[in-house]
């Protein structure tokens, strides 16, 4: 096929032409390229190609915000040919092009394969999320359970082992998967390093640090700590002087993004009077439309935006985030403080990117950034067709990273993509009910972790075989064809134990006593053991081996064989473990589900049937259902219980608790808390109920205004809206899973109480 070098007025790069050629040839494809290089253009070409036929295509993304953005983009181009399905949002679910989160696609592939039987292509955006500790399993299961007829377009940031990823996908779907790896950026990056209030090239930083290492690299350097408080001002001022704005300033804390944005706006001003008037009108319109007059966040953000400064993170209301995105895209904002989700969820590059720190909290502990994370965020620097160079400002903070660690992070190799496969109870139940035992074994062998482990299997197999041969070679062979060597060795070990015991006691006497007493005790010990020893010597003569001149040689060879046998057992165990990594985990979870009454030898019991349809806290939801809480509680109480199931308390983000309000919780909610928390003490995989925020849901469900809700808590507005929308998702899961019409109708009412006003208005924004 002859291809034009332009698509939608864009001149295609060579890697894009290669990718489109592979698509036209009907191949699946792994496309690895730097952030901002134009991978999405290939996906858009594929969607347009499929929409010209009667086939269907599914586009998956890692986060709802990105799904919503893609839905808005594609629906503007293709109208009602596009739909979206993200759990809490369902629009035109049977559309020819369906935009979904990866979790939704995985659920369809496992539970309702008929729904995707006519899908010809699936696009996996950000497939490197497969290496995410919390969510990576979803990507693997999505690929494993996809129809064999489907073709994949897997888009990834730069990863070194994309060939290995492609070979694994190829082994799962049984057809060829091509690889295109493009490492050249459309706009090259240049790194600057912040140190001692100035920006340096790397070679100059090296001289500076080595010249004053003793002065500046102490772990508790007070000067560094004070410098950190004003780091953002120094960086912004110098980039402004060098005409390197707009700037995306990345921080790993929402609270810090809020603080730095407001501080900067109160000390710096980047906008003209005309820009201020326009920004003010846009913000006022947003505040009026969504009734945000009394929200401190909205008023502070207005002050910041009017001076050309902003912030963007998940704690902001989606309506305010959208306003920030519009102003940044129009180049009205010069400095934007963002968290790392901006690098994934929003395709908005800038001339410069800066980091406030290089350590992050990952939900478990503080750790240095990984090279892949650093590369993806840094990739937001440099706008194609606008900038000749993208600038990345990296702080040198010795208490966080040594100079060598800093050098490796910026200039070192990116980590390989590693599998994080871990079966959920939902997956175990669906495997158990839908497949025979041997089929399950085969499925469990198809994950990426097993594929990576299989690389070692030939080496392990060879090692085991060599050890077996070596044991056979050294094992004693009696030239006299005597048959009592095994019995003799049991006797020999008993004799050795007695002699060892005697030796230890003699040693204790020698080191513990001196003079005449020592000699007396020594004589007593010798007498104590002499009789036993004489008896053993007599027994030794009864063995043919005991009288043989080859005895010492046979004993030596036997001991050598025993040592080799220990090695063999170790490597054989490792080989068995590597050969079926997931089967033991699957069997342990099956046994637990059997004890809990979810399965029997025939299949799923009623509890298992329900849990197999729930993807959020499935065991807790199932137990609440079978103990009558969804039936007996009011709609408002059901909503509050669901919120307590899904809410994740964030560090330093507020807990939402009002002691008096929490104490007034309805008895049914207190009862549910006691019930689930009792289960959680028995089973660590069950999360205790977070009831400190239940009063917020009850008030909202009963019709309170959002401003009144926010006056009751310190939880960020965006977090609370997102939690409410997650409850909507969970309620829909439960409604689809239960059979009683009366309960289904009740859950529909629950949804209506939540999905109103500002929560409804965020449906396609968050």
Write out the residue ranges for each language-model feature:
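Conserved pre-motif I regulatory segment
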Residues: 1-32
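Motif I (Walker A/P-loop) of helicase-class P-loop NTPases
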Residues: 39-48, 135-140
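Conserved nucleic-acid-binding Ia/Ib motif block in the N-terminal RecA-like helicase ATPase lobe
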Residues: 55-100, 104-107, 167
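Conserved C-terminal RecA-like helicase domain
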Residues: 58-60, 67-68, 75-77, 81-84, ...
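SF2 helicase catalytic motif II
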Residues: 104, 112-153
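Conserved interdomain linker/interface between the two RecA-like ATPase lobes of SF2 helicase motors
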Residues: 144, 151-153, 158-263, 310, ...
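Non-catalytic terminal extensions of ATP-dependent helicases
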Residues: 310, 329-333, 412-766
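Conserved segment of the helicase C-terminal RecA-like domain
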Residues: 348, 352-362, 367-408
């Amino acid at each position: 096929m002859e291809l034009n070098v332009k698509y939608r007025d864009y001149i295609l790069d060579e890697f894009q032409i290669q990718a489109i050629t592979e698509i036209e040839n009907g191949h699946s494809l792994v496309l690895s390229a730097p952030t901002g290089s134009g991978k999405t253009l290939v996906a858009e070409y594929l969607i347009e190609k499929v929409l010209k036929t009667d086939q269907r295509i599914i586009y998956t993304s890692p986060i709802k915000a990105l799904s919503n953005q893609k839905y808005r983009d594609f629906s503007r181009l293709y109208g009602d040919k596009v739909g979206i399905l993200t759990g809490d949002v369902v629009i035109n679910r049977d559309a020819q092009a369906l935009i979904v989160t990866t979790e939704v696609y995985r659920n369809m592939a496992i539970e309702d394969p008929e729904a995707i039987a006519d899908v010809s292509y699936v696009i996996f955006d950000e497939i490197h999320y497969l290496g995410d500790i919390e969510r990576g399993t979803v990507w693997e299961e999505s690929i494993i359970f996809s129809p064999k007829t489907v073709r994949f377009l897997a888009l990834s940031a730069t990863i070194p082992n994309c060939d290995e990823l492609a070979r694994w996908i190829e082994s799962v779907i049984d057809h060829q998967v091509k690889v295109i790896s493009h490492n050249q950026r459309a706009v090259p990056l240049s790194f600057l390093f912040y140190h001692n209030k100035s920006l340096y090239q790397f070679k100059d930083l090296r001289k500076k640090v080595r010249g004053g290492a003793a002065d500046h690299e102490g772990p508790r350097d007070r000067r560094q700590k004070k410098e950190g408080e004003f780091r953002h001002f120094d960086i912004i001022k110098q980039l402004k002087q060098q005409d390197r704005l707009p700037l995306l300033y990345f921080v790993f804390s929402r609270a810090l993004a809020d603080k730095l944005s407001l501080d900067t706006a109160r000390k710096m001003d980047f906008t003209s009077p005309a820009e201020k008037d326009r920004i003010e009108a846009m913000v006022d319109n947003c505040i009026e439309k969504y009734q945000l007059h009394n929200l401190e966040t909205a008023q502070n953000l207005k002050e910041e935006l009017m001076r050309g400064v902003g912030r963007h993170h998940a704690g902001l209301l989606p309506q305010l985030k959208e306003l920030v995105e519009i102003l940044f895209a129009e180049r009205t904002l010069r400095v934007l403080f963002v968290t790392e989700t901006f690098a994934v969820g929003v395709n908005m590059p800038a001339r410069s990117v800066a980091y406030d720190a290089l350590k992050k909290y990952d939900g478990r502990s503080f750790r240095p950034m990984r090279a892949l994370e650093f590369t993806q965020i840094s990739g937001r620097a440099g706008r194609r067709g606008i900038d000749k160079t993208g600038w990345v400002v990296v702080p040198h903070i010795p208490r966080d990273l040594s100079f060598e660690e800093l050098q490796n992070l910026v200039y070192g190799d990116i980590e390989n993509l590693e599998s994080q496969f871990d079966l959920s109870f939902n997956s175990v139940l669906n495997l158990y009910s839908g497949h025979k035992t041997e089929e399950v074994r085969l499925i469990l062998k198809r994950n990426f972790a097993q594929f990576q482990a299989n690389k070692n299997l030939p080496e392990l197999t060879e090692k085991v075989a060599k050890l077996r041969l070596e044991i056979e070679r050294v094992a004693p062979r009696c030239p006299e064809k005597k048959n009592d060597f095994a019995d003799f060795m049991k006797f020999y070990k008993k004799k050795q134990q007695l002699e060892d015991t005697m030796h230890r006691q003699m040693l204790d006497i020698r080191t513990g006593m001196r003079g005449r007493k020592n000699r007396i005790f020594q004589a007593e010990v010798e007498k104590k053991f002499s009789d036993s020893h004489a008896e053993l010597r007599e027994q030794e003569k009864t063995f043919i081996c005991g009288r043989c001149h080859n005895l010492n040689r046979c004993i030596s060879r036997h001991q050598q064989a025993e040592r080799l046998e220990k090695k063999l057992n170790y490597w054989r165990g490792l080989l068995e473990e590597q050969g079926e990594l997931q089967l033991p985990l699957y069997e342990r979870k099956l046994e637990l589900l059997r004890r809990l009454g979810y399965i029997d030898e025939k299949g799923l019991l009623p509890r298992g049937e329900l849990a197999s349809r729930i993807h959020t806290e499935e065991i807790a939801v199932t137990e609440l259902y079978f103990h009558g809480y969804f039936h007996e509680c009011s709609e408002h109480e059901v909503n509050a219980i669901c919120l307590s199931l899904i809410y994740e308390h964030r560090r330093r983000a507020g807990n939402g608790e009002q002691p008096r309000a929490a104490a007034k919780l309805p008895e049914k909610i207190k009862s549910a808390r006691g019930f689930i928390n009792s289960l959680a003490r028995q089973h660590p995989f069950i999360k205790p109920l977070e009831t400190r925020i239940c009063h917020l849901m009850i008030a909202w469900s009963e019709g309170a205004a959002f401003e009144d809700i926010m006056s009751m808590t310190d939880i960020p507005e965006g977090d609370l809206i997102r939690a409410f929308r997650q409850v909507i998702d969970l309620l829909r899961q439960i409604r689809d899973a239960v059979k009683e019409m009366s309960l289904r109708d009740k859950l529909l009412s629950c949804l209506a109480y939540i999905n109103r006003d500002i929560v409804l208005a965020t449906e396609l924004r968050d």
